[in-house]
Structure formats: C-alpha cells, structure tokens
C-alpha cells in the first residue's frame, strides 16, 4: 500500500481512538459524569456514599424490589441507607443506577470507585499476593470465643496508699510462704484492725485473694508460661494478632449490644403501634345447658399440682423418668394389680419399702428392679435384632442384689402405726386414705373456713352474730349494764382467774390492792354492796392482803344456851342497842338492814317473853310464826333475797368475838333498827325506775347546780391527767350528760368515748339530762375508764 494513503488513514482513527482509550481506563468516572450531563435533576452523592448506592442498586437490579424492601426494613435506623427513602436527595441517583443495571449499561460497583482509589487498589492488588488478599478478606469474620481474661490486672480499691501497701506486702509474703503463714498471721493479728482484710467477710478479701494468686503465678510460674513469653518476644506479630482479636471482640460485643437494643426498640414500637382495642368478633360460641361436650373431667388443685410437677420433671429429665414420677390414681392401681404379674407386685412392694425407709441405696435400686425370688420361666432364644453384647461383663464377679422384702417382713404404717405385711402395704395405704375420719377433718376445716368468712354465712348466722355483738357493745347499742355484766361474766367464768400475790412489802400494798380489784365483775360489786348493807354474811379475810391470824374459834352450831354465834372474822361490836321493854305477848320484829358499821353482818333480833325456852337450832333457820316485814318498794330489783332472820332472846346480848379484826373505816353512830324508810338517799342503791320524773324534778328544782366529778388515779395513762383530783362544774339541769363529758375532756384530755360516768350506782347515758337523773346541788359523779366490750377494771 502506498505511503500516502497509509499516512492519511491513521489521522481519522486516532480521533475516535484517543477518546476510547481513556474511556476504558476511566470507565467509572465517565459513567458518573456522562449521565450527569444529559440527565437534569440528579444529585450525585459523595464518593463514600456513592459506593454504597451503586452496590445496593446492583443487588436490587438482580434480586428485584423485594430485596430493596428487606434492606429498608433491616437498615431502618442506618443513616447511610437514607437514599432508599423517596424524599432523600440521592434517591433519584439510586433509581437511575438501578435502571442502568437492569439495562446492562452500568458496570459492577467496583468500577464505581473514584479514579484515585481505583489506582491505589490496582497497585495494592498487584503488589499483594493472593494469600494475603485471602487473609484480608477473612479478617471480617466474627469472633466466636471470647479472648482469655487478663491474669495480672486487679483494680485497686479506694483506700489509702499505706493500707494498699500493707495488703500487697501481705499478699507477697503469703504467696512466698504458703497458707500456713496466712493462718499464723490471722491468729497473731486478729485484734489488729489493719489486718481485717484477712477475714472472709471483709470487702478487701477478694482483692487480697487476687493479689495472692497473681504473686503465686509470678513466684511459681506454670509450665507453659516461659515458652509462651519467649514465643511472644520473638514474634511480635502474634501479640498484635491478640490485640486485634480483642478489639474485634469488643466491637462484636458492642454490635451485639446495639442489635439487642434495636430489637427491643423495634418490639416496643411494634407493640405501641398495635391498637389492642381494634378487633373484630369473628364468632361467638354459646354452650347450652343441655349440650354435651367431649371435655375432660374437672381436676382438683392437688391433681393439677401433681401434673405440673410431672411436666417439669418430664422437661428436665425426659421420657425415662416419666414412669417413676407418675402419680397414679386408685383406678389405675386396680388395673395394674389385675394386669401385672407377681414380679411386678414385688417391685411395687419394694418401692413402698423404699418410701418408708428413705435410703439412698434403695432409691438407686428403684431404677433397676431387683430380680424376684419366684422362679421365672426360661426366656426364649433371642433374635439377632435383640442381642446386646456387653464388653465389660465379668461372670466371676458377684452381683450385689438389693434387699427384697421377705414374705414375713412387716412395715410400720404411717397412718395407723400398726405393723402391716410388706406385700399388703400398698393396699393398706389406699384403704387408709379413705378413712372417714379424714372426711370428718375435711368437713370440719370447711366449716371453720365458712365461719371465718362471713360472706358465705346464711341469714340466721348473721342475725345471731349481730345479736351477740349488741349484747356486748353497750357503747353502740345502749343495752343495760346488768345484761352486759351477765354476758361477760358468763364468758369470764370459763377463763381461769389470775391470782394476785403480795410480796410482803408495805410499799407495794396499794398497787397489789389495785391489781386484786382489777377483775371485779358487776356481780361481785353487788355482793360487796350486800355485804356492806349487812344482808349476807361475809368473810373479811378474803379481801385482806398479807398474813392474818388463824381463826381460833371455828363456826359451829350454837349451844343450847345461845341462838347464834357471830362469825369470828367479823369486826367487834362495841355496843348493841337494847330494844325497849315490850309487853308479855309474843311479838316478833325483823331488824332491817341498817348500816351500823361499814361491813358488819347484822343479825335480826327477836324478843321472847321471859321464862320461855328455845330449843337449839342452826345459825340460820326459818322460825315459825314470825312476821317478816316486807321489803320497801324502793329496794333495787338486783338485790338477792335476804337471809331468814335469826331469833335471839330478849335479854340476850351477843358476846364480842374472840379474835377481833380492826375495822378499816370509823364506825358511824348506831341508829335504831326499825325505821328503814329513814335511810339517807346516798346510802341506797338507786335504779332508773326509782328516779323522779324529769318534768317534776325541774318544777321542784330551778337554777344551775354544782356537780363534782371524782377522777380516778391512773398513773399508767400518762397522756391523760388522771391524778385522783375532783372537778367541779356548774351546769343547768337541762344540760345533757354529754356536756359533762366534754368538760371532762377539756380538763383531763380523756376522750368522751373512753369515759364512763356513774352516779349513785347508775351508769348515766349521754342523751339524758341532769334532771333525768335527779342530780341535786353537790352531786358526786364517779369517772371510770370504759373498756372495749363493756369490761371494767
């Protein structure tokens, strides 16, 4: 070919070839810059983000939009994948790359790296061998096992430098001299506070133990420690690999932690997004009363608990333990007894014996049933599939047989305590659990629960409970005090009374008297009043505290010359009123209960004509032809019937007792016996029936009255001012008793609900007025503490 055409042909090709050569070398830059020129509205991301976008676009182009949705769900919190959102500025570039990858115009993501990075990768790929590249690729493998812990690192506690040096020096000596040195040091310095860290309860003991272990490893190093240190000193690369592995492990742990937190956050967000009230009722199933369903029988709580235990053991041990842990019912026991053979019965007997004796060796023997004593039929020749070859079989070794129960062996029944044959123990246990006494105990416990739980009590029980409550709570229902005392007295009779003992010192006499009078009931108070009135004979020695002289003259029937002997324990009678001279006809009078002395028993005196002879009689006897004076209408209804009068001759004067006891109070002047109506009003025991009507009392008495309140002396109630003082109030007769309680509360601090007021033997109520109780000027009201349930101290 001529030179001309040859020279002329090359110039045109170089024009297209020169731009083609750089396009092959700079394919990525041209692809990135080429679409930017014709396409308007595409924002190109920076190089590090562009690489991720290109890779994602290539995967989405190959795998479809489902892969994009999966990436968007997995990387919802990763800001590097925000280009997947339609509102992101790089989303248009991402869609453009996806379309190019689908059309085959774009290359793989590796070509999308900038030019400078491509040149560096090409140079490094040319320099590094293939093995090194494989190692670089394998560095991203997730570490499986944690790195070994540091052996010579222990964070020092926050103590002073001197104490830290003491701990370290002690650890060095213990590591050098051994545990014997530590024991001697603990015994020698047990009182030295600086060595308290040697005690296991101390907070520095763990740190001291770590130091001892570290110093021991240094002083007495393990076998492979020197070779390991020598190897690491010769090859620093191995140390760097260990450091890198630790760093990767730390990063892996951090990633796992973040992943768990993200999963928890996703779960929380998912739960928060659920509208739990937005549901649709698909179908409603109504069970009719006459409908019969294939449902299991109802279970008791005991059976349910047994099933739960069986399930837990099944999950823990598997199917092998299910038969041993199974709880069998009575019907299953009967079926097994009929179906099983005598060897199985022996196995069950062995299990019962193991349950009673509870030894570990026999529990192990339960898993492998012992060979029965009864002869077994010879087994059939084994088939090849059933042959089991034991390699450790020794025919000469003696086989330890677990103890089997002898035919005449007896076991003690845990229910009745009787000796039962071992072969019949299981049947005895089954029958013993059906004892009717157990049913009675169960019914009794059910009744106790029903009585405790008043919700299930029938109407009659509720009525009786309210009636009993009303009889005891007078502060609520206002029942008479006598009825309360009766009810509470009936309860107190059943309780043993606590006896108060005096220690013999005069200083404790008053306190012992208060303790002795603490449990006095209303009936005892009535008896004391009767004794004070002389209606019944009394034994004063019962109320005295301390040693007393024995009775020199016991009570005995009177001799013929005397009618009655006065009890020796009564105080002496200084003077007996001589009755006036009476005419000869027989006339009998009964001396009424006149309080001659504080507590002397008064005998009724009967005069007889002179010369008459009286036959001997007992101290208390009904005399014939005696005109008994009837009781006045003002007598309280609570008083017991008076004893029959005693007949005394006219000229008879009772002799004083041999052993006189001094009276506790001065004797009032003696009054003549007949006028019973002339008793002072304050001496009578009043009731509400004997009071004057309120309107009549107001007509007779006008103006305010002065009332005295006797406060008890209660030193144990320090919050109230109860020192035995007397409070004086001036109130109109129309005021209620509650006004007095308010004033007492203001003066002493004692709440009105705790106050109990008594006026002349009557417990006054808050709702009544002063005129209702006929309170005159100078009336004395006694204050007491109201106990819960009406009990009085």
Curated annotation (Swiss-Prot):
Give me the Gene Ontology terms describing cellular component. Answer: catalytic step 2 spliceosome; nuclear speck; nucleoplasm; nucleus; spliceosomal complex; U2 snRNP; U2-type precatalytic spliceosome; U2-type prespliceosome
Site positions per UniProt: Critical for binding to SF3A3: 169
Q: Which protein are we looking at? A: Splicing factor 3A subunit 1
What UniProt notes about the protein's domains is: SURP motif 2 mediates direct binding to SF3A3.
Where is it located? Nucleus; Nucleus speckle
Spans of repeat SURP motif: 52-94, 166-208
The annotated regions of Polar residues compositional bias extend over: 509-518
Q: Which residues carry this modification: Phosphoserine?
A: 320, 329, 359, 413, 451, 508
Xref: Pfam families: PRP21_like_P, Surp, ubiquitin
Q: Which InterPro entries match?
A: SF3A1 (IPR045146), SF3A1_dom (IPR022030), SF3As1_ubi (IPR035563), Surp (IPR000061), SWAP/Surp_sf (IPR035967), Ubiquitin-like_dom (IPR000626), Ubiquitin-like_domsf (IPR029071)
Q: Which residues form the Ubiquitin-like domain?
A: 707-793
List the molecular function annotations (GO) for this entry: RNA binding
In the UniProt record, the gene name given for this protein reads SF3A1
Q: Which SMART domains match?
A: SWAP, UBQ
Report if keyword Flavoprotein is assigned: no
